[in-house]
Amino acid sequence: MTENEQIFWNRVLELAQSQLKQATYEFFVHDARLIKVDNHVATIFLDQMKELFWEKNLKDVILTAGFEVYNAQIAVDYVYEDDLMIEQQHQGQQGYTEQAFQQLPAVQSDLNPKYSFDNFIQGDENRWAVAASIAVANTPGTTYNPLFIWGGPGLGKTHLLNAIGNSVLLENPNARIKYITAENFINEFVVHIRLDTMDELKEKFRNLDLLLIDDIQSLAKKTLSGTQEEFFNTFNALHNNNKQIVLTSDRTPDHLNDLEDRLVTRFKWGLTVNITPPDFETRVAILTNKIQEYNFIFPQDTIEYLAGQFDSNVRDLEGALKDISLVANFKQIDTITVDIAAEAIRARKQDGPKMTVIPIEEIQAQVGKFYGVTVKEIKATKRTQDIVLARQVAMFLAREMTDNSLPKIGKEFGGRDHSTVLHAYNKIKNMIGQDESLRIEIETIKNKIK
């Protein structure tokens, strides 16, 4: 495909996607291919049953793209698989049609090329999921089939799905791979039902080498008759032929309550792995990697401050960097200080800005008063049981009630490391869930501080 042909076709797809509903675009446009543009005629390969739709709905799109790229009115010649094969047989030569047909992928993978194992930041919270994903990519269909990855939003499940697909495709460019969300699988099912073309859907999904399904919990929410049945049959067809299946979800298979038991059982045939929110060190590593995409200087204390503000998922960290970029560009700032970062992310934080007006010294004083120890003892290294508890509670409350980063909190507690603060925070948080009297004590202290 020439450069102009590529620009023309990209523009056709862009215009079509902007005018059509997503499900309609996926069904009628997504698998079409431009073979060539010659003498102001675009030769487009597509399913024969979709030609009428193109004629009625996309003629203006092609005209617009034609004038933009070629400054001419572009006509269309639609060709189908049978046409290409017949022409090849009759001509007996390596003409453009044969070459184009050979280049047509059997299925559009829909993989995002930016996701790979190399740019996935590993930590203790995702190490097993990464190891399992790499194993599956290295030997698809033989190890951990299916692979079921579950965890909350924004933790990297989609990244791993695409990394698996891209890794397999790199080793085998002819592999038939499909990445799709469960929601889009349902949409395709609905379209094929309405058009009475279920054989086409079966052909598309049951002959894959690798099926990557994102957010499978969406399938459990749907009561449309036949959707789960079709996925069940697709799963069986692939699994029986040793073809790899990878699924992601926001919950374990056992908690997919509206999914048929026979599907849940099959999801547990292979390996189930969990991804949990990244710890502080992993968040620092993620931010250090992500800031390379921005033309700003991020001092280490700013990175650690941001890592301390968002601990639920990676998406929040990425969003925070976008917020900071917007503010920095507006103010024409090159170096992102903690103050600039705090200003930029204030609106993003779900509960608004935390009470930064509360000094850590005030928290230490109230905790010390409650437990009968001094602030000096809380900051020191003495490790008697009553002092250690007071110190850890004070660190917990400093993390809960202020905007200060973990390193900053550690500094206020005698220069302790951020990992010490994180350990104290996690320990008290876990104890609160098991010890009702401790929970009441901490609530009492919080009320006095407020």
UniProtKB/Swiss-Prot annotation:
The keyword Glycoprotein does not apply. PROSITE patterns: DNAA. GO terms for biological process: DNA replication initiation; regulation of DNA replication. It is found in: Cytoplasm. Plays an essential role in the initiation and regulation of chromosomal replication. ATP-DnaA binds to the origin of replication (oriC) to initiate formation of the DNA replication initiation complex once per cell cycle. Binds the DnaA box (a 9 base pair repeat at the origin) and separates the double-stranded (ds)DNA. Forms a right-handed helical filament on oriC DNA; dsDNA binds to the exterior of the filament while single-stranded (ss)DNA is stabiized in the filament's interior. Oligomerizes as a right-handed, spiral filament on DNA at oriC. This is Chromosomal replication initiator protein DnaA. It comes from Streptococcus equi subsp. equi (strain 4047). The lineage of its organism: Bacteria, Bacillati, Bacillota, Bacilli, Lactobacillales. The gene is dnaA.
